[in-house]
Amino acid sequence: MSDNKALPPAILLMGPTASGKTDLAMALSERLPCDLISVDSVMVYRGMDIGSAKPDPDTLTRYPHHLIDIRDPAEPYSAAEFRTDALRLMEQSVNAGRIPLLVGGTIMYYKALCQGLGDMPSADENVRGQILAEAEQVGWPALHEQLRQVDPVAAAKIHPNNRQRIQRALEVYRLTGKPLSHYWAADGANPENELNWDSVNGAALPYNALNLALAPVKREDLHARIAKRFQIMLEQGMIDEVEQLRRRGDLNVELPSIRAVGYRQVWSYLEGEFGREEMVEKATAATRQLAKRQMTWLRSWPEINWLSADDTQLVEAAMRLISQRLQSCNPL
């Protein structure tokens, strides 16, 4: 991915949740002619600020980020849309003589960007509406069984309670007559969002990308960061933020926005499903699981450059790696 020195440089700053990626990206932007592009599936939504650890408006004015606050929570934002938007913004950045710096931890977005999405069809609102109407009549277990009949490979990988993925698999089949697993095979893609590095090439991401991963050295330190950050979110008013979303009346837990880690647990708490203490436990546990998945994925990334979140000279360490990469590139 990064061995072609003729390609323009880009920086991919990844890492598990609560590792400090955003702060590092902003610090780097003080030293580099770069444009910040968010790679976060929750920060895309307006009104979902506290629970996504979104920088506040004053910070965003000082350090502008692309792909933040671009969707209403009722509107899905797909990995395909992210890829299109990110590639467009990266091209604009390079054309302006700057460096695109992508920062965030959403695995499926990086997968789409680096591996591509093949010829899988885009979402179709009419077909989705038909599937949702059927689900209301017969239930999602029946639709999962329907999926098993037309695409047993996908059905075996998709949990019967995962409504979004059942819907997408049926949608693809109805639009194309081909099972979703056909596209997985054609792409060399893994349905569990693990990257197949044999299929990553410059055609998918035509950049000389420097891969940076930020994380604490010790897992228990990351867990402590996660717990502390969620407590701070609660103190900042996350419960009120979620209550405002509930009061709208057009949002529900089936939407990708509301299913986001932290938001889903606070929403359920406000619905009376459990008490505050259990909500905190469930939210922090879900966030730890997210971080574990992110770390597992990052360990498989080739040419990864690890940075310690505990390093007192973190910015300098990152700048050394970036400077080395820029020196190896052709001039912009």
Swiss-Prot record:
Its EC number is 2.5.1.75. The record marks T106, R128 as: Interaction with substrate tRNA. It holds the Pfam family IPPT. Its cofactor is Mg(2+). Signal peptide: none annotated. It catalyses: adenosine(37) in tRNA + dimethylallyl diphosphate = N(6)-dimethylallyladenosine(37) in tRNA + diphosphate. ATP binds at G15, P16, T17, A18, S19, G20, K21, T22. It comes from the Bacteria. One of its GO terms (molecular function) is tRNA dimethylallyltransferase activity. Substrate binds at T17, A18, S19, G20, K21, T22. InterPro entries: Dimethylallyltransferase (IPR039657), IPT (IPR018022), P-loop_NTPase (IPR027417). HAMAP family: IPP_trans. PANTHER family: TRNA DIMETHYLALLYLTRANSFERASE. Monomer. Belongs to the IPP transferase family. This is tRNA dimethylallyltransferase 2.
